[in-house]
Amino acid sequence: MNEPDLTVRVVDFETTGLPPQPCAVCEAAYVDLVSRTGNVWSRGAVWSSLVNPQAPIDVEAMATHHITDEMVANAPTWDQVMPTLLERQPIGETRITIFAAHHAAFERALFDPPGAIWVDTYKNAITLWPDAPSHKNQVLRYWLGLKLTANLEGYPVLPHRALGDAYVSAGILRRQFIEGLALADMVKIAANPVLLPRFHFGEHAGKLLSDIPTGYFEWIVNKSRGPWDPDVLYTAQSILDVRRMTELKRSPVDPTAVAAAQADAERKP
């Protein structure tokens, strides 16, 4: 039997609530990217379904994705839908094991089958394009000039709906492959926090990290109650480490103290 094509399944879920509140899936979709010859990736299977979350949809979530309780009343449940996310199309003996999403931690909290390998197009984007105006998938869609259709194999493509967002994320992922980011590197990037180019919250939103006072990073790491996104904590701690080392190098202290501080910073994840 021939080896199956290498497939990365880009998934997206719409939910009954907004993070960090507990929520259930009310719509699921995927768009496959398939590599048949080296680093040439093309679109494969496409699928989308409303999901009965067996719980009411919060009105704030409803205002984002426009999925109502009436729309999902007769839809299949999550337990009925989830196996489809693993099936290779056309259905074969092997299952999909490589998944991608934009902010993959959200999808993984809802769907993380044993043995799954994950790629995060958001973290890839920060790594490849730190100077992008934003790393949200719809912003990247237009910033990158992605040419996407309004209808995908009979499914309408709408922003803030599962298929529309999966389709955009798949386009972003394909561009990331084209620009030379290897799948193995993507997997490593997804498994670790990334250094954010700027924060998008609080009094210093949008500023360069170099323009933010040290006290703000100290507040994030030591004094605030959070909970913080791991990337935010990693960024704040990394900036503090760099600034402390810089101050030590400028101060007339014992060189062994500087070396010890550098070694301590290098040991941190």
Predicted regions and their residues:
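Generic helix-packing signal
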Residues: H65, W129, G145, A170-R174, ...
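Acidic, divalent-metal-coordinating active-site segment for phosphoryl/phosphodiester hydrolysis
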Residues: R161-L173
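Conserved non-catalytic scaffold segment of RNase H-like nuclease domains
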Residues: M1-I117, T121-K123, P130-H160, P227
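Acidic two-metal-ion nuclease catalytic site recognized across multiple nuclease folds
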Residues: E3, G171-P269
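Generic detection of long, well-ordered alpha-helical segments
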Residues: A75, L163-A166, S210
